[in-house]
Structure formats: structure tokens, C-alpha cells
């Protein structure tokens, strides 16, 4: 045997067998791994692994045979092992086409999955861009919310200031009207304020009180004048009545001294003289009473006109109070508009809450995508939610303040209406006085008409009596003159006393009515009167001009 053959048998063949054994072993390991890990059919990899193991067995048998170990046994085994290995590889080869198809399907599936992954990546990119847009929108809305927050704070400060002014003004108006309802017309509302509506309300209330004060002063002055004049007239009438009584007594004494003379002329002159004198004196007295009644009518007419002027002034006060009620109602409408603004702020807060909820949802989406925008969205959402909570709290506080202002405004309106009712009562009392003056005027006019008729009748009778008396004048001039004067003075004194009694009664009734009017007017306190019912004139600070 040549050296080359020996080298081949000694080195190359064993080395090739070793390489083959190692290769079959590696193929078996690879086939088993693919059988376990790959998605291809398991039967192919099972056959591949089995064939590789047979190849390892065949190679080892061949190596042992060449090494002289159990030569006869391995000589018999190597041939079948080789045939089996080739057969198994052949069988595995027939399944290669199916495996290739499966691999192609697997490749297509992976390509489809890769395409889906690309689409998902593109979708994720679009979602990222959309998230960035939403983030920009959120930042813009955050800026707008911050601006709205600042505006809300400024508006809240303005509303708080307005509410404070309204509360202070309502309190002052209430105190002033309460003082006026108690009779103190010197109280005034401070009209120095920056709010035009509040200043207008204060001005209207002050004008109303000034008008009422001026009217009450005028009525009080008129009442005082009427009372004084009535008392003076009553006193004068009393003096005249006493003087008339004295004159009547003197005349009776004179008449007693002329009885003898009247007895001599009793058949002719006595009755005629007495009749004529009585008629003349009655006519004169009737004219005097008519003049007095005319003067009294003028006084009563003037009193009635003054009382009617007082009613007109009270009507003006009532119109002013109605205007004040309308202004307070307008103030209540203004608080209603402020309440609408508070509701608008509450609605903005609710919308801001919805914005915070959307921001939280976007933050959750951004966080699930693994991006860093989730935390930013969460922070923005928390800030927006805090802003919404603060806005709702401010809106609630404003609503409570408005409710309190509306309650105080309603109380003020009620107090003004009570004062208006009291003014109505005063107007009714003055109207009763006017009616009383009217009745007095009518009675005096009727008395004047009756006295005028009596005076005319007496004038006619006096003319007839003078013609009769002239026929007996020459008989007893001195006696007739004395008797006539005595009888005339006596009759005149009696008639004058009766007339003065009636006038005194009328003056006393007028004085009583004037006292009643003055008592009612004294319930009010003005700058001119100073006090009402003798009370102190101390008024709350800032409530009087």
C-alpha cells in the first residue's frame, strides 16, 4: 500500500468521519431546535433530526469499524445505517416543497404583519402629531383659562365691591326710612358714591324726605296759625259776650226808668216803637252777623285751600315714594343680572371641568403610548380642574352675596311701602280736615243766606214801621227816643249775644279740629320743629343734612 493510501486511511478518512459525525450531530441539534422553536411543520424537522442521528450513528460505526473495533458487527451495521440515513433524508426531501410553501406562507404572514406594524407605526405617528396638536390646543386653552381666571378675579373683585356698596347703601337707606317712619324727617342718606344707580336711589330718597319735611312744615305752620286765630277769636267772642251781657243789664235798668212814659204811650207808640226798633236792630245785627259769617267763610275757604295744597304735597310725596320703590326694584333687577353673571361663571367652570376631563383622557392616552406628554397633560388637567373648582367656589360666594343683597332690597321695599301707607293715612286725615272745612263753609254760607233774607225782610218792615212811628212822633218825642234806644240796645245785645254764642261754638269746633291736625303733624320731626312729642333730636351720624 502506498504512503498516500496509508495517509488517507490513517488521517483523512478518520478526519472526514469525525467531521461528518460532528456535522450530523450539529444537524441533529439544529433540527431539534427548529422542531421546538419554528412555526414550520414538526414532522419535517422530526425526520431531519432522526436522519441526522442516523448519520451520526453510521459515521461512528464506520469509524469504529475502521479502528478494528467489532469489525464484523459494524461491517454488517454500516450498510443498513447508511441506507436508512439516505432513505430518511430522501423522505425528508420529499417534504421540502410543502415546507417551502409553509415558509412562503410564513414569510407572507410576516410581511403582512410587518405592513400592519408599519401602518400601526404610521397611525402612531399620526396620533403623535394629533397629540402634539392637542397639546398646543391645551396650551392655548390653558392660556385662555388663565386669562379667564384673571378676568374672573377682577370681575369678582368688582362684584364684591358692588355688593359691599349695595349692602352699606341698603343698610343706610333702611335706617333712614325707619327713622322717617318713626317721624324723624331730618334723616338723610349719604349720596356720595361712585355707583350712579346707588347715588340716584340716595338722591331720590333725600328729595322725597326733603319734600315731606317742607310739606309738614307748611302744614304745621298753617295749623298753628289756624289754632292761634281760633283761640284769639274765641277769646274775643267771649269778651264781646260779656260786654253784651253788661249792656243788656244797663238797658234793662234804663227801661225800668221809662216805664211810666211807655205806659202813657202804650196804646200807640209803645208797640210800634218797639216793633220798629226791633226790626231796625235785627236788620243791623243780621247785617253784622252776615259780615262776620262772610269773613268766617273766607277763613274757612282759605283753610280748605291750604289743606288741599297739603294733600297735593302729600300726593307728590307719594309719587316720590313710588319712584323710590321703582328705583329699588331696578336695583333688584341689577342684582338679578349679577346673579346671571355668576351663573355664567359657574357654566364656564363646568366647561373648564370638562376640559380638565378631556385633558386627563388625553394624558392617559399619551401615557399608554410611552410618550413624555402624559405627565404634561396631567399637570395641565390638574391646573384646569383647580381653576374650575376655584371659579365654582367664587360663583357660589357671589350667589350668596347676591341673595343677601336681594333680601335686604326686599326689606327696604317693604319699609318704603310701610312709610307710604303712613303717608296715605296722613293724607286721609288731611282729606277729613278738608271735608270738615267744606262742611263749615257750607253751614256758614247757609247761615249768611238766611241772615241776608232776614235783613231784607227787616228792612221792609222797618220802612213800614217808620211811617207808623212818624204819626205818633210828635206825641212823645223824649219818651219815644228813650224807650226806643233802651229797647233797641236790649234787643241788639240779646241778638248779638246769641250770634256770638253761635260763632264761639263754631270757633271752638274749628280750634279742636286744628288741635287734632297739629297733634298729628307733631308726630313728625323736621329741621323747623326740632323735636316730635318732646323727644331728643339726636339722629344717627351721617343721616341728617
UniProtKB/Swiss-Prot annotation:
It is found in: Cell membrane. The modification Glutamate methyl ester (Glu) is found at residue 281. Residues 123-157 have a biased composition (Basic and acidic residues). Keywords: Cell membrane, Chemotaxis, Membrane, Methylation, Transducer, Transmembrane, Transmembrane helix. Residues 527-539 have a biased composition (Low complexity). Methylated by CheR. SUPFAM superfamilies: Methyl-accepting chemotaxis protein (MCP) signaling domain. Potentially involved in chemo- or phototactic signal transduction. This is Transducer protein Htr7. It comes from Halobacterium salinarum (strain ATCC 700922 / JCM 11081 / NRC-1).
Amino acid at each position: 500500500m502506498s504512503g498516500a493510501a496509508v495517509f488517507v486511511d490513517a488521517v483523512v478518512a478518520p478526519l472526514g468521519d469525525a467531521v461528518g459525525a460532528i456535522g450530523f450531530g450539529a444537524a441533529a441539534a439544529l433540527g431539534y431546535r427548529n422542531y421546538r422553536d419554528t412555526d414550520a411543520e414538526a414532522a419535517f424537522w422530526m425526520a431531519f433530526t432522526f436522519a441526522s442521528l442516523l448519520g451520526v450513528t453510521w459515521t461512528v460505526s464506520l469509524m469504529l469499524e475502521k479502528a478494528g473495533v467489532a469489525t464484523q458487527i459494524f461491517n454488517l451495521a454500516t450498510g443498513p445505517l447508511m441506507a436508512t440515513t439516505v432513505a430518511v433524508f430522501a423522505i425528508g426531501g420529499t417534504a421540502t416543497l410543502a415546507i417551502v410553501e409553509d415558509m412562503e406562507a410564513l414569510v407572507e404572514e410576516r410581511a403582512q404583519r410587518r405592513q400592519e406594524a408599519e401602518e400601526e407605526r404610521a397611525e402612531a405617528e399620526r396620533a403623535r402629531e394629533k397629540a402634539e396638536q392637542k397639546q398646543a390646543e391645551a396650551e392655548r386653552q390653558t392660556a385662555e383659562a388663565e386669562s379667564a381666571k384673571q378676568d374672573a378675579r377682577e370681575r369678582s373683585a368688582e362684584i364684591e365691591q358692588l355688593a359691599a356698596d349695595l349692602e352699606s347703601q341698603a343698610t343706610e337707606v333702611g335706617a333712614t326710612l325707619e327713622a322717617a317712619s318713626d317721624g324723624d324727617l331730618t334723616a338723610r342718606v349719604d349720596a356720595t358714591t361712585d355707583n350712579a344707580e346707588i347715588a340716584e336711589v340716595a338722591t331720590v330718597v333725600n328729595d322725597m324726605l326733603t319734600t315731606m319735611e317742607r310739606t309738614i312744615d307748611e302744614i304745621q305752620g298753617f295749623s298753628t296759625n289756624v289754632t292761634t286765630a281760633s283761640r284769639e277769636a274765641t277769646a274775643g267772642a267771649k269778651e264781646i259776650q260779656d260786654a253784651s251781657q253788661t249792656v243788656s243789664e244797663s238797658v234793662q235798668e234804663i227801661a225800668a226808668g221809662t216805664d211810666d212814659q211807655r205806659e202813657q204811650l202804650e196804646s200807640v207808640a209803645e208797640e210800634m216803637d218797639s216793633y220798629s226798633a226791633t226790626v231796625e236792630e235785627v236788620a243791623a245785627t243780621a247785617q253784622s252777623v252776615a259780615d262776620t259769617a262772610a269773613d268766617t267763610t273766607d277763613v274757612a275757604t282759605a283753610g280748605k285751600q291750604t289743606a288741599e295744597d297739603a294733600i297735593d304735597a302729600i300726593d307728590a310725596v307719594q309719587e316720590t315714594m313710588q319712584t323710590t320703590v321703582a328705583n329699588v326694584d331696578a336695583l333688584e333687577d341689577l342684582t338679578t343680572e349679577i346673579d346671571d353673571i355668576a351663573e355664567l361663571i359657574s357654566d364656564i367652570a363646568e366647561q373648564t371641568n370638562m376640559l380638565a376631563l378631556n385633558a386627563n383622557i388625553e394624558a392617559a392616552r399619551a401615557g399608554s403610548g410611552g410618550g413624555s406628554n402624559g405627565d404634561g397633560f396631567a399637570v395641565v388637567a390638574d391646573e384646569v380642574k383647580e381653576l374650575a373648582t376655584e371659579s365654582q367656589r367664587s360663583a357660589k360666594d357671589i350667589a350668596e352675596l347676591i341673595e343677601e343683597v336681594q333680601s335686604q332690597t326686599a326689606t327696604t321695599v317693604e319699609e318704603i311701602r310701610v312709610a307710604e301707607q303712613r303717608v296715605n293715612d296722613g293724607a286721609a286725615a288731611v282729606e277729613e280736615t278738608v271735608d270738615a272745612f267744606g262742611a263749615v263753609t257750607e253751614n256758614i254760607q247757609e247761615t249768611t243766606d238766611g241772615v241776608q233774607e232776614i235783613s231784607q225782610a227787616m228792612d221792609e218792615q222797618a220802612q213800614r214801621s217808620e211811617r207808623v212811628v212818624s204819626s205818633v212822633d210828635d206825641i212823645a218825642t223824649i219818651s219815644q227816643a228813650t224807650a226806643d234806644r233802651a229797647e233797641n240796645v236790649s234787643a241788639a245785645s240779646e241778638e248779638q249775644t246769641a250770634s256770638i254764642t253761635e260763632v264761639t261754638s263754631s270757633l271752638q269746633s274749628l280750634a279742636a279740629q286744628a288741635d287734632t291736625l297739629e297733634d298729628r303733624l307733631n308726630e313728625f320731626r323736621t329741621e323747623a320743629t326740632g323735636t316730635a312729642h318732646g323727644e331728643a333730636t339726636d339722629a344717627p351720624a351721617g343721616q341728617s343734612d
